[in-house]
Regions:
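Positively charged n-region of N-terminal signal peptides that target proteins for export
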Residues: 1-4
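Bacterial N-terminal signal peptides
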Residues: 8-21
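Flexible coil segments in periplasmic/lumen-exposed cytochrome c-class electron-transfer proteins
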Residues: 28-41, 60-79, 111-192, 196-197, ...
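Mature N-terminal segment immediately following signal peptide/propeptide cleavage
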Residues: 39-60
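Short cysteine clusters
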Residues: 55-58, 201-204, 329-332
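Aromatic- and charge-enriched surface segment that lines or borders ligand/interaction sites
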Residues: 93-105, 109, 113, 135, ...
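Extended, polar beta-sheet/loop recognition surfaces of beta-rich domains
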Residues: 247, 257, 348-393
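C-terminal structural cap/anchor segments
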Residues: 320-363
Length: 426
């Protein structure tokens, strides 16, 4: 009997240990599954945010491996080569920690403490929250590692000095996560956070001083150095301000690159194709709310031709332009300049044609262009290049004509303007 009791006691003990171990194992499995689920959610969020930040757009060479860097960015201060941000341990960021990544994104410093140049827009990315930064890092660490060493940047003297860069940062860089405007709605603040931070709109749509620093943060427009394109003001209805646009049309422009009265070309077309088309409906709506709210700044008014005092030579100048327009442009854009909505953009009343800088219009005539291929506009109509057909003088005549016909009023364009527009990114 004693042996039986001992046997039963041992059996109960074994069963208790077994069930206890099973309970611990189950708890561990649940915890591990929960961790995997959390990690998956973080990576998915990071993938979305990396797209909104257009990380791949810069950190991928033309025809190269995604995120492996090697793209050359030509600026007034030298040629910068983007870095490999895949998790390769030798040539990428495989040995980086979350803290290292945060230091780069928020403080503009590399893992080794080296100061980074603002061609990497940490001046805007500093507004990104730590939670979002960690999510982007988790996504980048989930990518396949690519072993790719990239050439060093070729920065002109004296801009290659870390001491001078430190001085530049003291004068022009203010770090800090986005602070919500409590007088605005949650939706407005979300749009502002995306546009000012990850979207880094101000990196292009701003006027810069001789040291390359943004002169304001109100998206008043400016020429994009090294690209030879003009990023129009987003706060002026004379350029690309959206204060009088319906929200749905702004959303359509962000996500498809095309509306009945407008389309994106050049660098902005690439941003829509690579980044903005992937905005969630909620975030696109929020960004539209923010962009629509920007105050009007109509200081960049182009001086048009005064037809009441126009000389015979000026009249002949525009008449010659009209003849060239009829021959090369009228088939698509029409005699009335109204084009075909959503297909061939209207030139009559088109702000991109009449804004102070004629640069984008000149480049479009020279090099042609297509709106971005997007989910909402999978087969865009395009315009052929005329650089091989028209002389600079003829391009100037056509652009001057369309800037001063059908009620348009803007300054005339010369062959010198056309010559200066050559080069840069098409």
């Amino acid at each position: 009997m004693k042996r039986f009791v001992t046997f039963c006691t041992c059996s109960y003990l074994i069963i208790a240990v077994f069930w206890g171990s099973l309970a611990f194992a189950t708890t561990d499995m649940v915890a591990e599954a929960s961790k995997r689920s959390t990690n998956t959610q973080q990576v998915e969020l990071g993938a979305y945010l990396a797209r909104i930040g257009n990380c791949m757009g810069c950190h991928t060479a033309k025809g190269g491996q995604p995120f492996a860097g090697g793209r050359r960015l030509v600026t007034s201060f030298g040629v910068f080569v983007t870095s490999n941000i895949t998790p390769d341990k030798n040539t990428g960021i495989g040995l980086w920690s979350e803290e290292d990544f945060w230091q780069t994104l928020h403080h503009g410093k590399s893992r080794d403490g080296r100061l980074l140049y603002p061609v990497f827009p940490y001046t805007e990315y500093t507004k990104v929250t730590r939670q979002d930064a960690n999510a982007i890092f988790a996504y980048l660490q989930s990518l396949p590692p690519i072993s790719q060493s990239n050439p060093a940047s070729d920065i002109a003297f004296p801009y290659n000095s870390q001491i001078l860069l430190a001085l530049w940062r003291t004068l022009f860089f203010k770090e800090g996560v986005y602070e919500p405007d409590l007088s605005k709605s949650e939706t407005w603040n979300r749009g502002a956070y995306l546009a000012q931070g990850l979207g880094h709109c101000n990196a292009c749509h701003t006027t810069r001083n001789v040291l390359g620093a943004s002169q304001d943060d109100t998206l008043t427009g400016g020429e994009i150095g090294g690209m030879n394109w003009y990023a129009p003001s987003l706060s002026s209805r004379l350029e690309a301000g959206l204060s009088d646009w319906p929200i749905d049309e702004i959303v359509a422009l962000l996500k498809t690159g095309v509306t009945e009265r407008s389309m994106t070309l050049g660098p902005m077309g690439a941003v829509v194709r690579q980044s903005l088309q992937y905005l969630s409906e909620k975030d696109a709506h929020a960004m539209a709310i923010y962009l629509k709210s920007l105050s009007d700044n109509d200081s960049k008014i182009s001086s048009g031709v005064n037809f009441s005092v126009m000389t015979g030579s000026l009249r002949r100048y525009l008449d010659f332009g009209g003849q060239l327009y009829e021959k090369h442009c009228q088939t698509c854009h029409g005699t009335d300049g109204k084009g075909a909505p959503g297909i061939y953009p209207a030139l009559a009343g088109n702000r991109s044609v009449t804004m102070k800088s004629p640069l984008n219009t000149i480049r479009t005539v020279l090099h042609g262009g297509y709106p971005p291929t997007t989910q909402g506009n999978p087969r865009p109509y395009g315009m052929p290049p005329f650089q091989q057909i028209l002389r600079n003088e003829e391009v100037a005549l056509i652009v001057s004509y369309i800037r001063n016909t059908w009620g348009n009023r803007a300054s005339l364009v010369t062959a010198v303007d056309v010559e200066r527009s050559q080069g840069g990114t098409h």
